[in-house]
Regions:
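Multi-bladed beta-propeller domains
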Residues: 1-15, 47-65, 89-94, 101-118, ...
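Glycine-rich His-Gly loop
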Residues: 32, 221, 440-444, 600
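Active-site-proximal cap/loop segments of hydrolase catalytic domains
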Residues: 472-663
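Beta-strand-rich domains and repeat architectures in extracellular enzymes and scaffolds
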Residues: 7-43, 207-209
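Cap/lid segment of the alpha/beta-hydrolase catalytic domain
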Residues: 394-514, 521
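Non-catalytic accessory segments flanking enzyme active sites
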Residues: 16-19, 159-167, 172-185, 207-208, ...
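Blade-terminus and WD-like Trp-Asp/Gly-His loop motifs, strongest in beta-propeller folds
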Residues: 19-26, 66-74, 121-127, 209-215, ...
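A flexible loop/linker signature enriched in serine peptidases of the S9 family
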Residues: 31-44, 59-65, 79-97, 114-117, ...
């Protein structure tokens, strides 16, 4: 059996978007695979039928974007296939092309096209749709122009790319570029007429929450004096009447989600952020006579926070029906499905360890989910009466002739709090030998490590490293009190990480204490920066997409103007000392650890200036350091970056540790 190689991720199949047909007899799912030749990903649709438990491919071109069911026998999806339309887009025009494919056979045919950026489609019937459109108020309607007028407008647009003018905050977004003046709008679209009818438009930014019985439920975010508001409102649009109704005003609630349930009820997931700040877990309410009535008062960690570098794409995390809702939550270090009846009875379904990445319910009453089980890559599973069944084998071949390591799990205690930790032993582990080790720290901080596969960790274990990781305080899955470390970054979280390191070194004497490295991304990068300024116990560090200075991060990051103030409980004008005390840059003069910095030039979440500052400070103080910048990548480099860039990133980190932990 050969060892898992760094480049083996090119063979992985990533699954997402599980969606059942209107009659619940069959489901769509998307697969994505690395396209090394074009340095991208090929995305295709597959059909799953519960009756025979089989999947079959529906597309092969690898260009599928958004997709949905048109009816029980036809699907629609976005793709760019017409060469003439591609040329228009290349010249600067904005178009979306939607294709229709019959399940009975035949080629996909263009169903309609629009001179807009369509980011979401909800089907009302074969002719009418609810579209979510990305609109730029600063851009003229070039697509409606002709002749010289269009040519001049395109030429001006090209020339204007040399400049960027902003008058809003945030003015850019990670993975989106500059967002100034851009809004997400909701429109009705009639295919035969080719006309759009606005539901919610500029200056508001709106997203569809649910559509049912001729009504659109949607969430609206506003800008006040050029600043994006942190609270939002909930609206209901009656398609037949063409009327909007405000259901929840914008002055109190941060609304995370909403939908229809039961026969005629509306639920809202929301929080006022009063007690635990912006990361406070939402409560779920029923909206009755204009009042928010608690439906379930449990402290729920909504969705899956179980991290991995082996996913691409999302999917449904909540399912609603006449009996209530089912939804994904993070429980300690696993994500599982819950049910909630209209009477308010919540049940956490007993499931295997791992992650539920998205799910839907079939007509047979069975729950189907895409998830990770048994330290392996994603597959499709069914769940009924407490029993899970694996239904697909997209990634089985990956494990046929390569070695992977199942981590040891254990708990430890710090400050009276029980915490979770894992250790991967090196492949071909010999208890009589000494090995180097790598400590990997998760991002967030409100996420978790769990019993799921991480490609980078498996690579290192196959190269002869111990790899260890834990969930310190500040993470998800254990309620608001556990997650709330506002104003105390680098305190109990750092204490937990150092205690875990002590425990690991004691439990595994085969680890060479002089050859231990530390790495992490985002919050994990922040903690890496923090650690090297507070201890010399690590022989090397790799800080990825990090934060080094809360003062600069606060007013450069796309979320900084509210995230920094909330998380470090200060601003430069209210308590500069507290902000600086929690900034790793303050302690850069104490660093002795050779450190690699990994950063993307389009990372607007933890901007590249954060990496520049820490790198420059270490160089100034004579510490061995290296900065590798990735052009055209953003905060998602390790999980969704271009394949060749993902390979180079892991090469850089691995080579750094090889240099300092082995040589």
């Amino acid at each position: 059996m050969k060892k898992l190689a760094l480049t083996d991720f090119y063979n992985y199949t990533f699954l997402s978007g599980l969606t059942f047909s209107p009659d619940k007899s069959k489901a769509l799912l998307m697969t994505k695979k690395c396209d090394k030749e074009n340095n991208g990903y090929k995305s295709n649709l597959w059909l799953f039928t519960p009756a025979d438990k089989k999947v079959k491919p529906l597309t092969s071109a690898g260009d599928v974007g958004n997709f949905t069911w048109l009816n029980d026998e036809e699907i629609i999806f976005t793709a760019m296939r017409d060469p003439a339309l591609k040329n228009k887009v290349a010249a600067g025009e904005t178009w979306t092309s939607v294709y229709k494919l019959a399940l009975g056979g035949g080629e996909a045919e263009e169903y309609f096209r629009l001179p807009e950026i369509v980011t979401g489609i909800k089907v009302l019937d074969d002719e009418n749709f609810v579209l979510t459109i990305s609109n730029n108020s600063n851009r003229p309607d070039i697509e409606s122009m002709e002749g010289d007028e269009k040519a001049k407008a395109l030429a001006k647009q090209k020339a204007d790319k040399d400049y960027e003018v902003v008058d809003e905050l945030p003015f850019w977004g990670n993975g989106m570029g500059f967002t100034n003046g851009k809004r997400s709008e909701i429109h009705l679209f009639n295919k035969n007429e080719g006309k759009l009818k606005p539901v919610s438009v500029y200056p508001l930014s709106s997203r569809v929450a649910d559509v049912k019985d001729g009504k659109i439920l949607y969430i609206v975010s506003d800008f006040v004096k050029g600043l994006a508001a942190r609270k939002n409102s909930l609206w209901l649009y009656d398609i037949e009447k063409g009327e909007n109704e405000k259901l929840v005003a914008k002055d109190k609630w941060a609304i995370r989600n909403a939908g229809f349930t039961g026969v005629d009820k509306i639920f809202v997931q929301a929080t006022d952020n009063a007690k635990h700040g912006m990361n406070e877990n939402a409560l779920i309410y029923l909206l009755e006579d204009g009042e928010m009535t608690p439906w379930c008062s449990d402290d729920i960690s909504w969705g899956s926070s179980v991290g991995s570098d082996c996913r691409l794409g999302g999917g449904k995390s909540l399912y609603s029906c006449e009996h209530g809702v089912a939804f994904i939550t993070t429980e300690r270090f696993n994500s599982v499905i819950n049910t909630l009846t209209l009477a308010g009875k919540r049940e956490i379904l007993p499931m295997k360890n791992g992650s539920v990445d998205c799910f839907d319910k079939g007509g047979d009453g069975v729950l189907y989910f895409i998830g990770m089980r048994d330290n392996k890559l994603q597959e499709l599973y069914s769940y009924k009466n407490g029993v899970e069944e694996k239904l697909t084998s997209f990634n089985d071949a990956v494990y046929e002739d390569v070695s992977t390591v199942v981590p040891d799990y254990f708990t430890y205690e710090n400050d009276g709090v029980e915490l979770d930790g894992w250790v991967l032993k090196p492949v071909d582990f010999d208890e009589n030998k000494k090995y180097p080790a790598i400590f990997d720290i998760h991002g967030g901080p409100k996420t978790v490590f769990g019993d799921v596969i991480y490609h980078e960790m498996q690579v290192w274990a196959n190269m002869g490293y111990f790899v260890f990781f834990t969930n310190p305080r500040g993470g998800d899955g254990r309620g608001n009190e556990f997650a709330d470390i506002r104003g105390r970054y680098g305190k109990e979280d750092y204490s937990d990480l150092m205690k875990f390191t002590d425990v690991v070194l004691e439990k595994y004497p085969q680890i060479d204490k002089e050859k231990v490295g530390v790495t992490g991304g985002s919050y994990g990068g922040f903690m890496t920066n923090w650690i090297i300024g507070h201890t010399d116990r690590f022989a090397a560090a790799a800080s990825q997409r990090s934060i080094s200075n809360w003062v600069s991060m606060a007013y450069i990051s796309d979320i900084g103007y509210y995230f920094a103030e909330d998380q470090v409980a200060s601003t430069p004008w209210t308590d500069m000392n507290l902000m600086w005390e929690q900034s790793p840059l303050k302690y850069a003069d104490k660093v002795v650890t050779p450190t690699l910095f990994i950063h993307s030039d389009e990372d607007y979440r933890c901007p590249i200036a954060e990496g520049w500052q820490m790198f420059s400070a270490l160089k100034y103080h004579g510490i061995e350091s290296r900065l590798c910048m990735f052009k055209g990548e953003n905060h998602e480099l390790s999980r969704g970056g271009k394949p060749l860039h993902r390979q180079r990133r892991l090469d850089e980190i691995t080579d750094w540790f090889e240099k300092y932990l082995k040589n």
